Swiss-Prot record:
Pfam name, any one: CAP
Signal peptide region: 1-23
Tissue: Expressed by the venom gland.
PTM: Contains 3 disulfide bonds.
Annotated localization: Secreted
Keywords per UniProt: Disulfide bond, Secreted, Signal
This protein's name: Scoloptoxin SSD558
A GO term from the CC aspect: extracellular region
Length: 210
């Protein structure tokens, strides 16, 4: 029979409280269907702009995939959001049965529109991305990793988790499978839009691949 000392029991209870998503007083928890659609559309439209060469300073993409929502990843992201801690999820926890590594973008803010505000903020890092970085990713310099994960060509799955706490701060965690931002690898293949699609072209977002 194992006996827990009072201090050990206290730590265990605190772990259970925080780990179960009770680390803060949540007023809003999770995403409804419209919010999921908004996040997915915003991401795919940004990817489409880049793939079609419509983003100033960025080459067009031959192999950028359309993103699809993945509920298994979404459960991971929601658990992370419910900690109400503005820190990246440990890499050991960012994986699913299909993806051994998930990329992650996170946001914290007290504005009433966290979804468009966060996605636009991540995308705005494009101003510091050069064609040389597109050809061979490197992170030494201005912060660009949120943008580059958003447009990483081989990423095909997206999910997000959302919490709004009683202090009006929203925590949005988005995870991407497979994750990107690998040093010295291309963000995407430069070339005519959707000219190197392995499984056909997207019908919903011309310029992206299936």
């Amino acid at each position: 029979m194992n006996i827990l000392l009072p201090s050990t029991l206290f730590v265990l209870l605190m772990f259970q409280i925080i780990g179960s998503g009770m680390g803060c007083d949540m007023k809003v928890r999770g995403l409804d269907a419209n919010m999921k659609k908004m996040i997915l559309d915003l991401h795919n439209k940004k990817r489409q702009i880049v793939a079609n060469g419509q983003q100033s300073g960025q080459p067009s993409a031959a192999n950028m995939k359309e993103l699809h929502w993945n509920d298994e990843i979404a459960a991971n992201a929601q658990r992370s959001a419910e900690t109400c801690v503005f820190e990246h999820t440990a890499k050991s926890l960012r994986k699913t049965t299909k993806y051994s590594y998930l990329g992650e973008n996170i946001y914290k803010g007290s504005y009433p529109d966290p979804i468009p505000r966060s996605v636009n903020a991540w995308y705005d890092e494009v101003k510091d991305v050069t064609p040389a970085v597109v050809k061979s990713f490197s992170s030494g310099g201005p912060m660009i990793g949120h943008y580059t994960q958003m447009v990483w060509a081989n990423t095909e799955a997206l999910d997000c988790g959302l919490v709004t706490a009683s202090d009006r701060n929203s925590y949005l965690f988005c995870q991407y499978g497979p994750g990107g931002n690998y040093r010295s690898q291309p963000i995407y293949k430069q070339g005519p839009p959707a000219s190197d699609c392995k499984n056909g072209k997207s019908s919903k977002y011309p310029g992206l691949c299936n």
